[in-house]
A protein has these predicted regions:
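Phosphate-binding loop of NTP-binding sites
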Residues: 22-23, 59-62, 71-187
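N-terminal leader/targeting and accessory segments in enzymes
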Residues: 1-92, 96
Length: 187
């Protein structure tokens, strides 16, 4: 029996997770409380991935084996509270993607400021050293989408504080913390 995964949010992160889950033979359903952009709707349709928009069907979501939560969805959202009450595992797209990278390496960059510049510079150095690498995460393709469509030996990942929510076993080979300031204290 296929494992049922529900992905909350149909932006870059959610659609990337849906593509990877589909390629890994999961039963996939994407749910977005808002309207899905034409670009992402076309990707879901062309890959025959089931989805809904402008609302969440709780009976389906609460029957999932696992939920992948997009980083823009706050922990205090009603649907997240219900999922937690049912003790359904909730993970991030970053956590999900790292399950399928095999022996590839990850350089993860996070911090309050300077993530994008540091990620781009690190990627540039690795690329010019002729490493088989991709820039993913909060810049470029989502981590999951890159793993699903064009796997590499090295991933240079910009990871925001929101993308670090629901991390369980993700352990990058190199972690860079640019700095810490009093940002996003409301989450």
């Amino acid at each position: 029996m296929k494992k049922r995964v529900v992905i909350l949010g149909a932006g870059e992160s959610g659609v990337g997770a849906a593509l990877l889950a589909t390629r890994q033979d999961y039963e996939v359903f994407v749910s977005d409380a808002g309207k899905i952009s034409d670009q992402y709707r076309a990707e879901l349709d062309s890959n025959k991935i089931a989805y809904e928009e402008t609302g969440h069907t709780e009976s389906y979501i609460l029957n999932a084996d696992e939920v992948i939560k997009s980083p823009g969805i706050p922990e205090k959202a009603g649907i997240i509270k219900k999922i937690r009450e049912k003790q359904i595992p909730v993970i991030s797209e970053i956590e999900f993607a790292c399950r399928f990278i095999g022996n590839s390496k990850v350089i993860a960059i996070t911090g309050s400021n300077g993530k994008t510049t540091t990620t781009a510079l690190t990627y540039h150095i690795c690329k010019h050293a002729e490493m088989d690498c991709a820039m993913v995460g909060n810049i470029g393709f989502s981590f999951a989408k890159q793993v699903a469509t064009d796997p590499r030996e090295l991933y240079v990942a910009e990871i925001s504080s929101f993308q670090l929510d629901d991390i369980v076993s993700f352990r990058p080979d190199v972690a860079i913390l640019t700095n810490i300031t009093e940002d996003h204290l409301d989450r």
